[in-house]
Amino acid sequence: MKKFFLGICSLFFLLTSCWNNDDPKPNNPDKLTILAYLVANNNLDDYLLANIGAMYDGLAEMKEEATLLVYWDGRTAIGDNNSKHLILKYQTDGRGNINGAPALDPSCPLDDVLAEGEIVKEYDTQYSVDKDVMSQVLTDMIAKSSPTKFGLIFGSHASSWLNSIYTRAFGQDGNGDNTMLIPDMVEALSAVNKKFEFILFDACYMGTTEVAYAFRNVCNYQLSSVMEVPAYGFPYEDFIKYLYKGNVDDYKKVCQSYIDFYKRLYSEGNSAWATVSLIDSKEMDYLASELKKEIVAHKNVLANYDTDHLQEYGRSNGPYIACDLGHMISDLNGGTIPSAFSDQLAKTILYKGCLEKARPASYAVEAMNYSGLGIYIPVEARSNWNKYFKTLDWYTASGWNEVTFSWNF
């Protein structure tokens, strides 16, 4: 869950005017549209609204034409639409104008940014975490855009692959009962019949093997954090221009921007922590295959494996959510990661970054034991998780089904 609050206004430039009159020349229009699916009907409402503001500010600085479509189910300030769920469109001409008007300055109220969005679709109240709703909304968003390539941002609460109400796999629409399982998300995306260039998970714990494997066939790349994402989320104003480029080097810049942002906050005395990875989805099958070899080779050890000495990423929600994948493999092999596994991990994780100094200090990550992916290691204390874990495709693909645990699994 996103955990801390930053004063929204202090994160924007303090300018005396509410209009930006710069007039740079545009380049050729970019062929990729970004879709942002924000499940904000919860205590992240203000933070996700701030994310829209940050995306808007990033668009205003672009020198090329670009389109952003946002699904918003939080509060609104748009006339009588308070009970509506909306698709909002923001289109920059690359000359400082958004939706045909000079871009608002970053100092303007965030509700004004929301009101500047062109309403291209309205829905009656609906559950945004329903797979049919998600599929329909994404289909509608794609229909409102002419390009054939799309990137996708998910913003909300999340807890990796876990299925219980307490942990929330993805999203929270109203009360804690209304959440979404990862397989349902994948089914919703598959129904759209469009492979996304990337998925950026602005949500906690999504940088795990279980999640990355689940989404491997619906997107080319995944940008995610294995631990909690701070409340402010990703600093879109710093990097959204890179997302539109649609290549690996620019996705790496997105990840680096995320790390640099939280390093800066830490240096200024604020609460700050971060992990982020760029995952090549097409490599997840090969990684699962290499992992299966390791799990089968060490199945007797894993039958009663003590994970307490491994780097663990559930800092606020208690232990066992995810241990570091590379650290586990190294530990099973006497402190060395076998070359075949190491080579495949390097092909899969194209960028990894973390904060070794964090505030609170318990959120610090040891870089030497950070591989860029977390993994759930079945433990007896999590019987409810284990029951659901066995239903995942990952359970068999990674070889966990080959382990005979010393306790009732």
List each model region and its residues.
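Bacterial Sec-dependent N-terminal signal peptides
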Residues: M1, G7, L11-L35, V379
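N-terminal extension/subdomain marker
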Residues: W19-S146
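Terminal, contiguous helix-loop blocks that mediate binding/assembly
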Residues: N27, T139, A143, A158-W161, ...
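Conserved, well-structured functional cores that handle cations and Mg-NTP chemistry
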Residues: P147-F154, N163
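Residues in well-ordered beta-strands of folded domains
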Residues: L35, I153, G374-Y376
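Structural motif
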Residues: T33, K149-G151, F198
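Glycine-rich, histidine-containing beta strand-loop boundary motifs that form or position
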Residues: V70-W72, F154-S156, S225-V226
